[in-house]
Amino acid sequence: MYVSSLLFLYASESYESFIFHFQMCYNKAHNGFMPSIFQQLKGLGEGLQWKVGISLDHQEKQTSSHEKEMTSPNSATRLIPSDWRRELLAGTVSFFAAVYIIIVNSSILADAGIPQEAGIIATILASAIGCFIMGLWGNAPLVIVPGMGINAMFTYTLVQGMGLTWQQALAAVMMSGICFFAISMTSLVEKLRTAIPASLQEAISVGIGLMLVLIGLHKGGVIASDRSSVIAVQSFADPGVLVTLATLALTCILYIRKVPGNLLLAIIGGSALAYLFKAVPSKAATGVGGSSWSSYGDLFGQLSVKGASITTLVIAVFSLTLVIVFENVGLINAQLKMSGRTERFKRVTQATSLTVILSGIFGTSPTVSTVEAAAGISAGGRTGWASIATGTLFLLSFIAMPVITLVPDQAVAPILIFIGGLMMPAVRHISFERMEEGLPAFFIIAFIPLMHSIVDGIAIGFISYALFHIAVGKWREVKPLFYIISLLFVMHFVLQTM
């Protein structure tokens, strides 16, 4: 009778009732009353263990043993159904938190001369393949996409500032990825991170954030170049200005209220406002030619160093590598701690560096481990399956390409401004009590946006930091590797005068 009842409960998936009756049978059998039934129950229980997540012999240790399995390198093969659902949910949450990058990154790449359609395809491929590599090699729930800030460095510093073509800039991306991969195979990645003072690392983040704000205001038509005052605010009678500011307000409100997919919703809302108030140029209103892959053929694998100055290329690769290391190492470490997977640090760093190499081939700015992965980790992501789920959704976004190409600048610009604002809290970690540390940090923060060059802003901050510490007799506090980096930046400025 017990066996037939259990089979009925099993078939009806009444797990709680099944477990209760199963334990009764097991206890009686274990005490010697029904040895034959015990054997039947034991066989049934062993076959059912994957479904209800209990162990006949170690039920009281289920939670702790399962946690150990979830953090082991091969845990993906031992996931129970509830784990699979949680990983899928986490990957979906991460995707909707980061999907805005498809629109924003392609818009920034377009300013470098890369066709927007091709930029969309490159962004999707780099994100999808990056997430797959992270899931399969890194086995961690992190998300890899082209980084905000470093994409601005690609377009506005390397291409527009240093005079590289986008083909040469892509070559610099691939070479910086190779450097990052070589560094990730050794202990140099940690030495490089610790050699740079924390105040300067935080200042770089703040400076890039301010540069994003400046780019966003200009892209949204709120400000424009002016000979008399350098920057001039545009008329608020312009519908484009009003749409940009309204979308910025919408973005902030959605974020403050913690609405899921807030940035994506803000882009959709901003696009609707732009078309409603006819703030969209005719070119954007008609799209850029559908979802044809023909334009991508002119981008994929087109990286080239032909015609590039060796010194300019070296500085570009060196600066990119520094920023890539800074953006990734600290964030990877924090997110792995959050997910309880700190033992995966080396593999995750290697996976990230591999995707940077592929970024140059696909035709986009460097990929990074993005902060949006925290949303997926909070939703329960613990293994690489969450990343694989995110990558799969990125591939499926190809379906939406005809719609993505219709998104106007007025819907993208507020996202740049908002993300720049999110980078401001880093200023709290900068100490201005010791001016030999505070002033170089200030120089980086001010000069990156005002000189419109991430490389030059970092260079001035690094050189002044070394100089000030020597001047006040605290040169021993600075690591030798930092002096070497500072000298390389000095050479950068010297070569510019020749």
From Swiss-Prot:
Inhibited by the proton gradient disruptor carbonyl cyanide m-chlorophenylhydrazone (CCCP), but not by the sodium gradient disruptor ouabain. One of its GO terms (molecular function) is purine nucleobase transmembrane transporter activity. InterPro entries: Azg-like, NCS2. This is Nucleobase transporter PlAzg2. It is a multi-pass membrane protein. Coiled coil: none annotated. GO terms for cellular component: plasma membrane. The keyword Lipid biosynthesis does not apply. The keyword Ion transport does not apply. It comes from Paenibacillus larvae subsp. larvae (strain NRRL B-3650 / LMG 16245). Its main location: membrane.
